[in-house]
């Protein structure tokens, strides 16, 4: 019966049945069960060894993973710190870039403003340069005109003195009427200085007209004169100096003319001075008297021309319309009248061509002019002479 029972199901066999078995069956069955148990224990031990081995492997792997994880965590921390550092640098760079951008915008705007300012200044400087060049050209023209006027005035003085030389050589003591039909030369020769004066009279009159206009402009009031805008300091100072000198000379002349003087009459002047000397005086006096001051002279000239055709030796009456003797010396008044009459008489002379004066004749004419100036200086007494007044450096050019 025991043989028929399964080996692995002994626990299910009841005890009564086991009692019925024989000893041999029981021993055999026990040994078999012990063998099975031993095999099971061996298998279990092997399995435990395998499990332990696998556990050891897993533990080792876990340790390695832990180490790797720790390393990765360390690397991650370093990377995190590096990222924070880089982020700080990025923020700083961004802030710095914004500051540089603002600085660049501000610098660009400032540079553009400065460039526009410098361009405006450059344009102004170009305009000022053009104005200075134009004013320099105008000043050159003025200087050339003043030089020409001064040279023309000197030639007028030399030419007008030739008639005095001819009158002295001819022994004429009085002023001769050039419109009475007689010869215009004392010797009747075509090469005399008086004849030469008739030839160049119109040219000299044109130059003297320019001198009169220039000096009338200089002697005009300050608000009537126009100084070009933008003149440099040297030119404006020079013009102001000229105006100051002209005003000073006008004041001195007015003071001189306000004191009456009756030393010389019209007859003495006409006997003492020949036409060349009186024309030289007229040339000097026109530097300080405008044409409006001589507006009453044509009445006197017309009366003189219609009366006798020659200059009379009588005194001039105060009812002639000219400035009274209480305002000007009689010598200057009579000299101006004689000069105006002679200028009107000389306009009737015919034009003739003659050669220029020789050097000897020019020297004689200059000496006669010096004599006339000395006479005019003696006529004013202790007062400043006309020559000192008229040679007041009013024609000096700016340095």
From Swiss-Prot:
It comes from the Eukaryota. Residues 151-199 are annotated as: Disordered. Its main location: other. The keyword Ribosomal protein does not apply. It is found in: Cell junction, Tight junction; Cell junction, Adherens junction. Residues 155-169 have a biased composition (Low complexity). This is Coiled-coil domain-containing protein 85C-B. It comes from Danio rerio (Zebrafish). The gene is ccdc85cb.
